[in-house]
């Protein structure tokens, strides 16, 4: 549960037939079974999980700017997307600065702080996020 909440990769090795490699969004990428008892997969530890709010156009913009150099996986049921550079010369920090998006962890923390103030009877502070004035639920050019 901790790994899912904090968006970590999980690589398990068990004696039964269900060893797994799980991505930061909880999806099984590889799994052993009765016939396949060894699995492997490259894992890029420079990745970012982001929330779609205010970022609907970001995956398309990244893929257009860096074709074949950055992998973006979409998990719309969870309102998340995963960004992983394939090219070693590109970092997620660079992509976040260039396209103005924050990690899901930053997004959720901003909301926790706002909710805390509301519960204390105070107005939430103005949101200062990487997205600026982008629309919450729409793609932009």
Tell what function each PLM region has:
Residues 46-141:
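A short C-terminal boundary segment appended to hydrolase-like catalytic domains
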